[in-house]
């Protein structure tokens, strides 16, 4: 069901992008916007993983340095029925993890030094299972496409606004065109953000459920989420300096905490609800 919802939401997001192109340049603008979207998605497909890893200065962990971690990831990947992803370490005290890569054969799981310091092996196993679930469900590609189109919508809306301000006062545009571009400038990025949130939240719940099945212990992930949520609040000032807002949706827990506005527009569902669902899943499995 969440797959159908994701396809529909991506369709709406693409339609919004084409509409922005049409408002800027009519039929020609819509065609240009379409090919621009295709080019950006091509770029996101091939290079988004490299950009994310470089942003966090992540380095691949050789097997010799952490054989226990490699063995854990290999076991979880076997349970999920996918190839073992490469493992990277991001040198930051913020405890978090994310997955990236264009498909299961070219995937990466990245953990921070902070998460290795605060989680027990079983809790870390739950987190890694969640990230492997994202790879199995191909959420990485979907989130990259959604983020790319969403960013492009904001850019097009801004272009439309400023082109009406400085592009002359021909009769075809006039005050009506200015009002239309102003509405697009304000509403299009908000609509794109809401759609991205809906996609991301839906797939986080799915990754929690799939991850719990992969590691066969929902409580491991639930307890990890409790610790990570607490740490996210404690380290919010550090995260504000180190975390790029454009990549926060990739993390297992949103590291950007603080304001009520940030919570309102969070790409993650409430951690408390995620934990509640995992405890309910554990009860059904007889783990509690």
UniProtKB/Swiss-Prot annotation:
The keyword Chloroplast does not apply. The chain crosses the membrane at residues 1-21, 23-43, 140-160, 175-195. One of its GO terms (molecular function) is zinc ion binding. Binds 1 zinc ion per subunit. Keywords: Cell inner membrane, Cell membrane, Hydrolase, Membrane, Metal-binding, Metalloprotease, Protease, Transmembrane, Transmembrane helix, Zinc. It is a multi-pass membrane protein. Its cofactor is Zn(2+). Coiled coil: none annotated. Zn(2+) binds at residues 130, 134, 204. This is Protease HtpX homolog. GO terms for biological process: proteolysis.
